Amino acid sequence: MIDLFAIVNKGGIVLWKKTNSLVNLKCLQVLFHEAFLSEQRTVNNTVTFDRYTMQYQEATQYSIVFVVVFQDLKCMAYSQSLLNSAHNIFLNLFKEKLEDRQVPNEAEVEKLFAPIFNRKSAQLENETDTKSLPVEANNDNSARKKNEYEMKKKGAQSKQTNAPKKGKKQLRKWDDQITEEEQAALNYSSQASSASQTVDNSQLSSIVGNNNKFQKTGSGDVIISDLEMDPNQTISNKSASSAFSLFSNLIGGKYLKEEDLSPILKQMQEHLTKKNVANSIALELCESVKASLINKKVGSFDTVKNTVNKAFRDRLTQILTPSTSLDLLHSIRSVRKNENRPYTISLIGVNGVGKSTTLAKIAYWLLSNNFRILVAACDTFRSGAIEQLGVHVKNLQSLKGSSIELFAQGYGKDSSFVVKNAVEYAKQNSFDVILIDTAGRRHNDQRLMGSLEKFTKATKLDKIFQVAEALVGTDSLAQAKHFQASLYHRPLDGFIISKVDTVGQLVGVMVGMVYAVRVPIIFVGIGQTYSDLRTLSVDWVVDQLMK
């Protein structure tokens, strides 16, 4: 049985999906990276990730991709037929709408497409079950094919069976995802001698943290796991203990009126505010949901609670889902290949939000992808700022040797001058990425924010990310707006939310910041070690808000 079938547009939005088992939705992100963003081409429209095999078929003219995900290799016998059928059924049903450059909504797909698809899927599965894969005891070709199936299933997870040579330390495997042998970036570098290390091996381990959150794709890229409560967690539709118990007293089979919704939406607004969503945004969110539900008929098989639950989830997902690609690795490689210059990333933010630590985490991840990193120390005012960066760089050198360096020109220098010199140095020494640390500044201090505008105007940066704390309340909105306004004729490129591990379910600040300036969350920080960096799972955030 297939584990997941999904219809996804090229923007990464899931139009419709059917799951038959718990599936880590990270696999869809990996598929899009491998199939459409990576320079390496996929073979037979197939991508492997973790324990999953993914096959896809694209309706190129409409930018729609049909995806089937499975673990049981028997599914390979009919997966392509299922994709072909799904492709033809979907285009026949919605051709007129697609020709008008419209996309059917989930309800339309569920009503028209799902019944036909389910019958076809069951038919193909039953036909496969009546047959067995041809295995002949004396047929070498059959045995070879069977072995190929087994190797494909294991993929990058296949284990070394040869015993290590005597006297050599046995290499460690990190939850079947990345080995030290495959990814030297995630362990002690052979280039750094023990004499030059600033910390011993036991200290290095505590600094690095839990590396199994970094996962290796088929093309060799090391990607960061989504923020989830558990690495195997999948998104649940449970709502018994959620805020939507507020709607249990409404009866199905009626047209919803404003008087039905207003009292309960007021309670919902209070619930969101308690989750750290700014009051103004919680109010606007509730008003938006109310407008979408008034005069909507709720059938007897579609409870009011589920209807309102879905409306809130859809709106929150719309707010948090990025409208552009967040594939930083692809952007870096594109600039290096096409423009032959270092890629520049600057971190900005108020004092004390963890910019230096966040920069070190990003550096560690980029080093794991074999980029050469130059760290530019542009906080030339805060006492000890350069030394703090120096500690991080020395630690990372202990892990990766000369692949990372610190560029510093002392205190009191103009940050724009330092960046200009850093870029020249990076060009001369073949660095791939420059990570720029900047001075912390109060967002309501016009003098300090004015210097940020001067810095942005004088330096042509590829990305500017604002680092912000998860637990700052409604002040986060003011921070986001002021930093956005202080950049010279360009928007912020994204947020990095630090200290998310300290807020539990109070994740509403993320909604507020994204909503305030319409830029996405690139990463979230969940601790102090170099591997405590995650990408945002929109579904996870919505689940936390709705609990």
UniProtKB/Swiss-Prot annotation:
Region (Disordered): 124-174
Major localization listed first in the record, in broad terms: endoplasmic reticulum
SMART domains recorded: AAA (SM00382), SRP54 (SM00962), SRP54_N (SM00963)
One Pfam family of this chain: SRP54_N
Signal sequence, renumbered to the chain: none
Subunit organization: Heterodimer of an alpha and a beta chain.
Domain notes: The NG domain, also named G domain, is a special guanosine triphosphatase (GTPase) domain, which forms a guanosine 5'-triphosphate (GTP)-dependent complex with a homologous NG domain in the signal recognition particle (SRP) complex subunit SRP54. The two NG domains undergo cooperative rearrangements upon their assembly, which culminate in the reciprocal activation of the GTPase activity of one another. GTPase induced rearrangement of SR drives SRP-mediated cotranslational protein translocation into the ER.
Official protein name in the record: Signal recognition particle receptor subunit alpha homolog
Organism: Schizosaccharomyces pombe (strain 972 / ATCC 24843) (Fission yeast)
Lineage: Eukaryota, Fungi, Dikarya, Ascomycota, Taphrinomycotina
Gene: srp101
